[in-house]
Amino acid sequence: MMLDLGPFSDEKFDAKRWVNSSCQARHPQDSLEKHLVDLEMKLQIASEEIGASLEEQSGGALLRVPRATRDVLRLRDDAVSLRGSVAGILQKLKKAEGSSADCIAALARVDNVKQRMEAAYKTLQDAAGLTQLSSTVEDVFASGDLPRAAETLASMRNCLSAVGEVAEFANVRKQLEVLEDRLEAMVQPRLTDALTYHKVDVAQDLRVILIRIGRFKSLELQYSKVRLKPIKQLWEDFDTKQRANKLANERSESQRLSSGDEFQSTSSQTSFASWLTSFYDELLLYLEQEWKWCMVAFPDDYMTLVPKLLVETMGVLGASFVSRLNLATGDAVPETKALAKGVMDLLSGDLPKGINIQTKHLEALIELHNVTGSFARNIQHLFAESELRILIDTLKAVYSPFESFKQKYGKMERAILSSEIAVVDLRGAVTRGVGAQGIELSETVRRMEESIPQVVVLLEAAVERCIGFTGGSEADELILALDDIMLQYISMLQETLKSLRVVCGVDGTGDGVGSKKDASAEKRESSRKMDLTSNEEWSIVQGALQILTVADCLTSRSSVFEASLRATLARLNSSLSISLFGTNLDHNLSHLKSEQTAGDLSMAGRASMDVAAIRLVDVPEKAHKLLNLLEQSKDPRFHALPLASQRVAAFADTVNELVYDVLISKVRQRLGEVSRLPIWSSVEEQTAFPLPNFSSYPQSYVTSVGEYLLTLPQQLEPLAEGISTNGDSNNEDAQFFATEWMFKVAEGATALYMDQLRGIQYISDRGAQQLSVDIEYLSNVLSALSMPIPPVLATFQTCLATPRGELKDVMKSEAGNELDCPTANLVCKMRRISFD
């Protein structure tokens, strides 16, 4: 058994643990005593071996110390000697550097002189070559060898750049420019012929010549000039066909008039929208052919030549295109078609009054824009290999004819919506007369309620038109227009409410100040109103309650529309933020590499093909303004239609005020003269028998009010059922609605009654008993409606029911603490009770 000494070197060595583990590792047949003896003997032997080894190694180390000391001393002496040698070498190097610095400087000057001499020699060679080229260039031109002439002119240009601004060669520089123009003029006819007849080899050779003399721009211009001719002819075919059709129609009309028959012309004017589709199809086919031909003829330039051709085309056709678009919008409406005018003429105010911009005008423009959008998508696919900047410029040129219309989109939309809102009829067309007010009110309320979804549909259509026509780039103008139109519509509703107040009999009756009516006339007028109320009061009440549904519908529909508008703005924010590259907008597209193509464009590059981004990418101020607005739409507190939201709330308040005035009008009418009733001051008649001669029943004025209040829940029930559709929550809302209005009217009636009671100057004992009965009846009605009795009304009832001689004692008793003191004192004053 070998003894492992490893555990003894561990700093955390535990002797007890080591002994226990050794005992556990013994053979089962060995006794513990024997194992411990063997272990002790092995430890002792190992200890002796370690001690002997240490003694031997220590002796050897002592013998090596003197030798090592001598070696260290020798190395120290060598180091001192080496340091001295190095110091001497450094001193010699410093001396050598000082003596050779002048030599090196002289050599540097000589080298500079050599370089200048070589440059001068080369310049002289270039000058000599330039002189020789100048003398032989005419011969080269005379030979008609255009490639050689191009090489000669290129060599002259290189020589001139080497010579620099030397006065002696100023004439040569001018001569070179003249020669380059001359060579370009010689190339152009051949280039025109090569482009016209699609001569690939000739076109390539001429391209090399133009590039050699730095006139590649001439190739672009000549290419566009040649290729534009068939496109312009294609564009002018529309006017030619229109004139031909017009002449044919006039000829047919003259023949019909001369012959007297009913012959009708079969020829008709071709609409610009249908013609534009065919024009775009033919133009796209033409560009596809050019793209393929240029890929062969100009493999390095086709990705710029063909897009620039389209840009030049749209530039040449721009004014005519805008004019045709304008006339095409006018053709959508007979009035403007007859005058040969369009939407731009309407906006400028050149047409007679009564002819306004209609939805059809803008829809026709959007249809043409959609046709152009389809063409633009095909162009994007065709030019996908071109650089992003070139592609965006090309698509911007395609949409350029619509730019003037887009800039006036807000004005167009506002005019369209304003005219559409103006034709909304909110008044019920009913002849005034007895029994007609209720019908007129009901019809007007019905029309008001039906107009709300109609107006919302108009606003939603405007949002769709904005997205379809401008891609959302005019969203800020759209919001302003929608807000203004909503204000216009709500103003119409407010004016209608004012007229309904007259219909309902709660306004427009005059204040009576300065009235010249005599007493009999006033009595007849009051009688007529009473008759009218008895016949129509409940129909007017029902009609007035229906106005609440108008306010509720307007509030809910406007809220839903505004939420939908915010969602639309949020979607625009997401798409435009990506399209316009965020903060890189100020730099436009400069962060994209010039060699980057659509094949490896980033997401932002691909999204930039959006019609709105194409329009905004070069107008960062407008883009940032729009993005700021769209970013604000994310805030839950944001109101897309801020002014309209305020006016909707104000309209709801006005409706509530009108409904309350209608519901309280009968109460106001019945209680209007209560404080001046003669019964309050009447006295008891003297009779031979002590019998009461006052009425123990409530008077008609208070029973009429009570019956009205008790009947009111039945009138509110149909409207509450209309609010409650499905679900317990809606039922609870309906119950709350009915209860709320019931309490409003009851509280108002109670307040009016108490005001009349306060106006009584004197009341007799008989009058007090009668008024106590009236108040008790009204209190019972309020209790039946689950309304608390106001303390003031309860005080009136208590003080009036108490006999005159006992009132002082009641007020001084504990029961008097429950009374309203000012009211109790007022009753005492009415009953002429003094506390002195």
Curated annotation (Swiss-Prot):
Q: Taking the first listed entry, what is the main subcellular location of this protein, grouped into a coarse class?
A: Golgi
Subcellular location as annotated: Golgi apparatus membrane
The alphabetical list of record keywords is: Coiled coil, Golgi apparatus, Membrane, Protein transport, Transport
GO biological-process terms attached to the record: embryo development ending in seed dormancy; Golgi organization; intracellular protein transport; meristem development; meristem structural organization; protein retention in Golgi apparatus; shoot system morphogenesis; unidimensional cell growth
Source domain of life: Eukaryota
- Ranges for the region named Disordered are 246-265
State the deletion phenotype: Abnormal coloration and morphology of embryos leading to bushy plants, with aberrant organization of the shoot apical meristem (SAM) and unexpanded leaves with irregular phyllotaxy, as well as small and round epidermal cells. Disrupted hydrophobic layers of epidermal cells. Mislocalization of Golgi proteins (e.g. ERD2) and altered size of the Golgi apparatus.
The membrane-topology field of this record reads: Peripheral membrane protein
Tell me which GO cellular component terms the UniProt record holds.
Golgi membrane; Golgi transport complex
Q: Does the keyword rRNA-binding apply?
A: no
Can you tell me which family this protein belongs to?
Belongs to the COG7 family.
Q: How does it assemble?
A: Component of the conserved oligomeric Golgi complex which is composed of eight different subunits and is required for normal Golgi morphology and localization. Interacts with COG5 and COG6.
Its function, per the record, reads: Required for normal Golgi function. Necessary for embryo development and pigmentation, especially for the expansion of cells and organs, and for the formation of the organized shoot apical meristem (SAM). Probably involved in the generation of the extra-cellular matrix.
Q: Which PANTHER family match?
A: CONSERVED OLIGOMERIC GOLGI COMPLEX COMPONENT 7, CONSERVED OLIGOMERIC GOLGI COMPLEX SUBUNIT 7
Q: What is this protein called?
A: Conserved oligomeric Golgi complex subunit 7
Native source organism of the sequence? Arabidopsis thaliana (Mouse-ear cress)
Lineage runs: Eukaryota, Viridiplantae, Streptophyta, Embryophyta, Tracheophyta
